[in-house]
Amino acid sequence: MAANYNNSAWFYDSLARLVYGKALVNAQIYLLKHIPENGKVLIVGGGTGWILDDLAHIHPSGLQITYVEIAPNMMALSRKRNVGNNQVTFINDAIENVDLPADFDIALTPFLLDNFTDENLAKVLNSIAALLKPNTLWLNTSFQLTGKWWQRIMLKAMFIFFKLTCGIEASKLPGIDKCFEEKHFKLVEQQSFFGEFIGTRIYQK
């Protein structure tokens, strides 16, 4: 069920920069201002882990980060990141297989949820939601379609490419906003990047 980008670890960041410039990075950095000092942070699907470097720049110490990533090669790159004096627990597994206490202050899912079918998206969302405290913020970044013709072409090309190279299950975007709404999360902030093809959302439990 889980999307696994293990085969793309060595070229993923370079490909992202080639296609999107800094848009993928900027969309995620935009959300980091919401990470609380001394917070307990859950990151699911962190990829190559560059976001840990940026978190350490903002919060050099005090964070307790649990970093869940299913792809071993991605995890190997993530472990090499500069985390400052923050405490990081690396878990190389799918989030639905992980047993953690339900005491996280904030969750980040960068380009994770758009990899699943609607059925499996609901399961993944439930697994993460169960680990969050009441009123917790969930910071999500995903691709989105806003009616521009080129977005569908790029999206289809991405799904075909990563289905062939990494075996992702999705062939179209799932209903991410709808799924959050059904789980009674409140949308509190949103921002778009790269011609509205990339959307960041902040939800509150």
Please give the residue ranges for each predicted region:
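C-terminal alpha-helical "lid/dimerization" subdomain adjacent to the S-adenosyl-L-methionine
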Residues: 141-183, 191
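N-terminal, positively charged/glycine-rich alpha-helical extensions of SAM-dependent methyltransferases
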Residues: 1-11
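Conserved alpha-helix/loop element of class I SAM-dependent methyltransferases that forms part
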Residues: 21-38
